[in-house]
Design a protein with these regions (language model features):
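Conserved helix-loop functional segments at active or binding sites
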Residues: 54, 228, 265-269, 354, ...
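Glycine- and Gly-Pro-enriched alpha-helical subdomains that act as flexible
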Residues: 73-113, 243-342
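C-terminal binding/interaction regions
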Residues: 118, 122-123, 136-166, 171-173, ...
């Protein structure tokens, strides 16, 4: 491994020169096996690797993430896919999937529109089944601790040999302090080594104290996802999978709305009318995603108008009405929501309830904690105060 890698440019083409390197002259813990990753690619790679590594350490399950612009569009652990999962994530065969393949398919499926052109991260060695799935997705690159020969051959051939494949030393531990230069001024802070585990969920402040094992895993998934999401951030999780990440908003309730809206979209993809859509032959996955996204929105006429629907569908679909969407979303339950900082008002809990949130993990510490707890109690939610802020910039 080299001690320095020259990059094409920085965040933008005019920002040259650009490189990554080790200040102490030691070898980089990463090796490029294919392609030529850029500056933002490596920001995604190194943030996403930390997320999946910590997620596996905390849960004992293989983990994956799908990153865009230094925040996760999705993250998940390697639980099996249901038949509905296979359909909405475009798994086109009935073959057995490895746990790491399931983890990435679920991470990618959290918000397929945002994951278009993603950076993939795997906690475990990338196998052939995972590589075959990525082969058919629009993606910029991948980081993993290793690749089987079959997987590497598939990925190295993607995008005419330009797909970015990065291998990282899984034993690498970063220094205790980190620095960042802004406008010529150097900032220094301790690296965030804080460990997220079940001990963080001990202070359940609501009348409902029942947080089952599955919900505890979902809380851990949400909190570790938030630890590597640009703040402010809120994350909805169900069955070990992020289903809505509200990232980078200045207003906490806007984070909650964004995460909730994305969770609603994820759930609407499972509506019988959506599952029954008949697409034209040969349609690409990305075009199916676009068509579904518009179909379930209030702008559905954009894909259902005469002369338009024929571009997407073999049979013209019936409209999915607002009433049908609301009725379907109302059946969602058992969702976990995490927040990287405290809720200042109960309105966040009110919005969370509309997306089926039953469990909440947030730091607490607001002067209106009583109002937040009261609102959670109104809906019978179980809420844990973690007493730990998870800002990330």
């Amino acid at each position: 491994m080299a001690s320095e890698l020259e990059l094409k440019y920085g965040c933008n083409p005019n920002q040259k020169p650009s490189r990554i390197y080790m200040k102490d002259g030691s070898e980089l813990p990463v090796k490029v096996l294919s392609g030529k990753p850029g500056y933002i690619n490596f920001l995604d790679a190194l943030n996403s690797w930390q997320l999946v590594r910590e997620l596996k350490e905390a849960t004992g399950l293989p983990a994956a993430a799908s990153f865009k612009h230094v925040s996760p569009a999705g993250a998940a652990v390697g639980l099996p896919l249901s038949d509905v999962d296979r359909k909405i994530y475009f798994v086109d065969d009935e073959g057995e999937l490895s746990p790491i393949a399931c983890a990435y398919i679920r991470a990618r499926g959290a918000d397929r529109m945002s994951s278009y052109g993603d950076w993939a991260a795997l906690s475990d060695v990338c196998d052939e089944r995972t590589a075959l799935y990525i082969k058919h997705e629009v993606s910029d690159g991948i980081i993993a601790p290793g690749y089987t020969p079959e997987a590497l051959a598939i990925l190295s051939a993607k995008k005419g040999g330009k797909y970015n494949v990065v291998q990282i030393d899984p034993d690498y531990v970063c220094p205790a302090t980190e620095t960042k230069d802004v406008f010529g001024i150097t900032f220094e802070q301790g690296h965030n080594f804080f460990r997220i585990d079940r001990d963080l969920l001990a202070d359940v402040v609501t009348a409902n104290k029942d947080i089952p094992e599955s919900a505890q895993i979902d809380m851990i998934v949400s909190l570790i996802t938030l630890k590597y999401t640009q703040s402010n951030s809120v994350c909805c999780v169900k069955d070990g999978q992020a289903i809505g990440v509200g990232a980078g908003q200045q207003s906490r309730v806007h984070c909650t709305r964004l995460a909730g809206n994305k969770a609603d979209t994820w759930y609407l993809r499972q509506h019988p009318k959506v599952l029954g859509l008949k697409f034209v032959d040969g349609i690409r996955r990305a075009n199916r995603d676009n068509a579904i996204d518009v179909y379930i929105s209030d702008e559905h006429d954009d894909v259902l108008a005469e002369g338009e629907w024929q571009k997407w569908f073999a049979v013209k679909p019936e409209v999915l009405t607002r009433e049908e969407k609301a009725a379907w979303i109302a059946t969602q339950t058992g969702v976990t929501l995490g927040s990287d900082a405290f809720f200042p008002f109960g309105d966040n809990v009110e919005r969370a309830h509309k997306s089926g949130v039953t469990y909440i993990a947030e730091p607490g510490g607001s002067i209106r904690d009583d109002n937040v707890i009261e609102t959670a109690d109104k809906y019978g939610m179980a809420m844990a105060f973690t007493h730990m802020r998870l800002f990330h910039h």
